[in-house]
Swiss-Prot record:
It catalyses: L-glutamate 5-semialdehyde + phosphate + NADP(+) = L-glutamyl 5-phosphate + NADPH + H(+). Catalyzes the NADPH-dependent reduction of L-glutamate 5-phosphate into L-glutamate 5-semialdehyde and phosphate. The product spontaneously undergoes cyclization to form 1-pyrroline-5-carboxylate. Pathway: Amino-acid biosynthesis; L-proline biosynthesis; L-glutamate 5-semialdehyde from L-glutamate: step 2/2. Its EC number is 1.2.1.41. One of its GO terms (molecular function) is NADP binding. This is Gamma-glutamyl phosphate reductase. It comes from Rhizobium meliloti (strain 1021) (Ensifer meliloti).
């Protein structure tokens, strides 16, 4: 017990020092030129490509440990890096580099009758703490996005991706050095100890301005319950697709299979399929067969079970489950009203899609469902900052304060007011 207490003290002391250094780095970073930040990001991307072999070797260690632990295949997919994924990671950083620098942007401006000129201007948030689990690419995305927005960042990756994340972080540090920016602007917690998470949630004596958790329900719940600083919550992606009677069948089949099976382990993967009861004969069998043929397990409501014998019966637990695997729950609903009721009952407010040709159905879907991302005639797998033209994302925020949807460069800023006068005094 005494050893544990001493160990926690050591971790807390280390984290406080990391916080102090991050806060110190945030000051010059907030005023760094757009050109210097661009140079750092381009250099980071180049180093990542150059060190592909080192990153893959580190990832192999993480994969070996994960397989020995007996984790699910979907987890392995999220953890796995390949040459192609590393190239994509570098391309993502380059895309972030080419975004317009948000810092200093005048969001709005106006003149008062007394002659005062008021501007609302974008500013960095300061120091951001990012806590994530198995995806090593978050290291690159989060580091690059925070830098572009003029923020320092403290990264705490999961123990499962520890070696991969450290190898990627070394590339980011090298890019900062090349551009002459503080290397402490992007720091990674060098231990897998869970006490480090607890320390970050305290705010590190005022060093951390906001926490971004990216991971499973238990991680996000812990952060929301214990954090003493603001949180951009990235909840589970319990995403729905509703196929209306007015939908084009071939389009519906293509979108449904892509939304579920393109990458089953990402938060934008569809987890529940809702089919308009009025068009069950037209859609049910073709859609379910397409999913099964693609290797997906379908868990169906009782009224769908007769369409394809042998399907597993869905329970209430299924409607509340983010599978992150080749599994989907499916049911018939009473048109758009039934779809809205189901989604508003079970959704995690992440992403929902409607496949329909009836404009009235689409309008009701968009106006009566309050999730962060709503799509019409498109796959839920477009729920991604890169696909939104943001260059990347730290996560998909499902709350309603400050940031919502993909958390990109713009969402990682705050604002201040600049007021210009000519000698005015208040009467």
């Amino acid at each position: 017990m005494l050893e544990t207490v001493e160990k926690d003290k050591d971790v807390n002391a280390m984290m406080l020092e990391i916080g102090r250094r991050a806060k110190a780095a945030a000051r010059p970073l907030a005023t760094a030129s757009a050109e210097r930040k661009h140079a750092a990001l381009v250099a980071m991307a180049g180093v990542i490509v150059t060190r592909t072999a080192e990153i893959l070797a580190a990832n192999a260690l993480d994969l070996e440990n994960a397989r020995e632990s007996g984790v699910a295949s979907a987890f392995i997919d999220r953890l796995t890096l390949t040459e192609s994924r590393i190239r994509d990671m570098a391309d993502g950083i380059r895309a972030i580099a080419e975004l317009i620098d948000p810092v200093g942007e005048v969001i709005s401006e106006w003149d008062r009758p007394n002659g005062l000129h008021i501007e609302r201007v974008r500013t960095p948030l300061g120091v951001i703490g990012v806590i994530y689990e198995s995806r090593p690419n978050v290291t690159a995305d989060a580091g690059a996005l925070c830098l572009k927005a003029g923020n320092a960042v403290i990264l705490r990756g999961g123990s499962d991706s520890f070696h991969s994340s450290r190898a990627i972080h070394a590339c980011l540090t090298e890019g900062l050095k090349v551009a002459g920016l503080p290397e402490d602007a992007i720091q990674m917690v060098p231990v897998a100890d869970r006490a480090a998470v607890g320390a970050m949630l305290t705010g590190l004596n005022g060093a951390i301005d906001v926490i971004v958790p990216r991971g499973g329900k238990s991680l996000v719940a812990r952060v929301q319950n214990e954090a003493r600083v603001p949180v951009f919550a990235h909840l589970e992606g319990l995403c729905h697709i509703y196929v209306d009677a007015s939908a084009d069948r071939d389009m519906a089949k293509k979108i449904v299979v892509n939304a579920k099976m393109r990458r089953t382990g990402i938060c934008g993967a569809a987890e529940t399929l809702l089919i308009d009861r009025n068009a069950a004969e037209k859609f049910a069998k073709p859609l379910l067969e397409a999913l099964v043929d693609a290797g997906c397990e379908v868990r169906a409501s009782d009224d769908l079970a007769s369409v394809m014998p042998g399907l597993k019966a869905a329970t209430d637990e299924d409607w509340a489950t983010e599978y992150l695997d080749a599994i989907i729950s499916a049911r018939l609903v009473d048109g758009i009203s039934g779809a809205i009721e189901h989604i508003n009952t079970w959704s995690s407010a992440h992403t929902e899609a409607v496949i329909a040709e009836d404009p009235a159905v689409v309008e009701r879907f968009f106006s009566e469902i309050d999730s962060a991302i709503l799509l019409h005639n498109a796959s839920t797998q477009f729920a991604d900052g890169g696909e939104f033209g943001m260059g990347g994302e730290i996560g998909i925020a499902t709350g309603k304060m400050h940031a919502r949807g993909p958390v990109g460069v713009e969402q990682l800023t705050s604002f201040k007011y600049r007021v210009r006068g000519t000698g005015q005094v208040r009467p």
